[in-house]
Curated annotation (Swiss-Prot):
Name under which the protein is recorded: CASP-like protein F16
Ranges for region Disordered: 1-30
GO CC field: plasma membrane
Gene from which the chain derives: F16
Main location: membrane
Subcellular location: Cell membrane
Keyword Protease in annotation: no
Extracellular side stretches: 59-79, 130-159
Membrane-spanning segments: 38-58, 80-100, 109-129, 160-180
Assembly: Homodimer and heterodimers.
Species per Swiss-Prot/TrEMBL record: Gossypium hirsutum (Upland cotton)
Cytoplasm among keywords: no
InterPro entries assigned: CASP/CASPL, CASP_dom
Length: 207
């Protein structure tokens, strides 16, 4: 009876290596699931922003006694529409891929890293050039004979400003995604190992 009681008292205090490995594996799976869910949501946010900016700009046109203007009249705004459409499509596709449980391989990490970087610069360029056009439309520039048009087409400029602001928010999301994909890629590489030079040490001792 004493042995059995001692045995019962010791058993809960000790855990087998297999049990420890199983618990750590479950914890890793929970962490991976949480990270996968967070990344999926982070990739869906710029998709929604891109669609919103695209729709606002597509519907942006105004007519009055002075004439009519549409987003298609300006190359910068056409670029903004195309860039938001491409980025929204990529965000949806990458979110679907990120949501699927699969091992993170080196080719996959490189693909996400490169595409996230490219799309970040694409959407940033669209937002920047559209901002310049909006500035000229508001302030004008006599040096290039560009007159201020927002006083005449205030509604058009207002919608264009909304689309550009939404695009800049999408740029922030893509910048965060670029950091995440960079981290996932470069953590797969081993840290450099410093090998001490025995020749130098020997020279120092003999000197």
């Amino acid at each position: 009876m004493e042995k059995s009681e001692k045995g019962n008292g010791v058993a809960p205090a000790t855990r087998s290596p297999m049990a420890l490995m199983g618990s750590s594996r479950n914890e890793n799976q929970e962490v991976n699931t949480s990270m996968r869910t967070a990344e999926t949501m982070l990739r869906l946010v710029p998709m929604a922003l891109g669609v919103a900016a695209l729709v606002v700009m597509l519907k942006n046109s105004q007519s009055n006694d002075f004439g009519s203007v549409s987003y298609s009249d300006l190359g910068a705004f056409r670029y903004l529409v195309h860039a938001n459409g491409i980025c929204a499509g990529y965000s949806l596709l990458s979110a679907i891929i990120a949501a699927v449980p699969s091992p993170s391989t080196m080719p996959r990490a490189w693909t996400f890293f490169l595409l996230d970087q490219i799309l970040t610069y694409v959407i940033l360029g669209a937002a920047a050039v559209s901002t310049e056009v909006l500035y000229l439309a508001n302030k004008g520039d006599s040096a290039i004979t560009w007159s201020a048009a927002c006083g005449t087409f205030a509604g058009f400029c207002h919608k264009a400003t909304i689309a550009v602001v939404i695009t800049f928010v999408a740029v922030i999301c893509y910048a965060v995604l670029s950091l995440v994909s960079s981290y996932r890629l470069f953590t797969k590489f081993d840290a450099p190992v410093n090998y001490p030079s025995k020749t130098i040490e020997a020279t120092v001792f003999h000197g």
